Regions:
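Short, small-residue-biased leader/transition segments that mark boundaries at the very start
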Residues: 1-8
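Flexible gly/pro-rich beta->alpha loop and the following alpha-helix that scaffold active-site loops
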Residues: 9-74, 87, 92, 97-101, ...
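Conserved G/P- and acidic residue-centered "switch" motifs that form tight phosphate/ATP-binding loops
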Residues: 77
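Hydrophobic, aromatic-enriched interface-forming segments
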Residues: 80-82
């Protein structure tokens, strides 16, 4: 059933995770805690926020198996960050400290409006969904993709040079975006197209 909830009793029990994944047509990695810098081999700086080790362990296993099985994966905000870190890339732990700019990355409500521009790469998977060129997106994050994971492709950049969307080109649908289409799809047809593309891939 679409959107059905699953109760995972032990997030480090791989047998239980396999059973759950076997009932899924796709994997959605949502926003939330900061990604533990240990995932990408770094020490946490003071500005790094709260992390959740159990979540990182669980999502690392689910992502690894989803990639192996070529299940559709859609990462949103923390989701794109975790995808990149778990697959071998790195993150900015705190943008104000490590990548200061005038671009608004930590907006205030309402969240269904665009606050900065991105440029979508011509010929990319994302361009096929929403079109290449300039788009306006919402933005609510303080971490971001830094060094791209091996095998991943950057599909969009913000005005200050941050990677805003990635994919794994040789997979069916493994896509991550830094913005929040789930906040804006009722008003923004491009966000709706993105959500629909994931649903269709599943």
């Amino acid at each position: 059933l679409v959107g059905s909830e699953m109760c995972i009793r032990d997030r480090e029990d791989t047998e239980e995770l396999e059973q759950c994944l076997g009932m899924c047509d796709g994997l959605l990695l949502t926003g939330g805690h900061d990604v533990d810098p240990a995932v990408y081999g770094e020490e946490a700086i003071p500005e790094c926020g709260q992390c959740c080790h159990a979540r990182d362990v669980m999502e690392a296993y689910l992502l690894k198996r989803a990639v192996e099985k070529d299940l559709p994966v859609f990462g949103i905000c923390r989701g794109i960050q975790f995808m990149n870190a778990s697959l071998g890339g790195t993150l900015y732990q705190d943008l104000d400290t490590q990548h200061p700019s005038e671009t608004e990355h930590h907006m205030t409500p309402p969240y269904d409006r665009g606050v900065h521009k991105i440029t979508v790469k011509e010929g990319s998977l994302l361009a096929g969904m929403i079109g290449a060129g300039e788009h306006s997106v919402n933005s609510y994050h303080h971490q971001a993709v830094k060094e791209l994971a091996p095998g991943a492709e950057a599909m969009a950049y913000s005005e200050d040079g941050l990677i805003e969307a990635i994919c794994i080109p040789d997979k069916k649908f493994i896509v991550g975006v830094q913005w929040h289409p789930e906040f804006a799809f009722e008003k923004d047809p491009e966000c709706l197209k993105l959500v629909q593309a994931f649903v269709d891939a599943c």
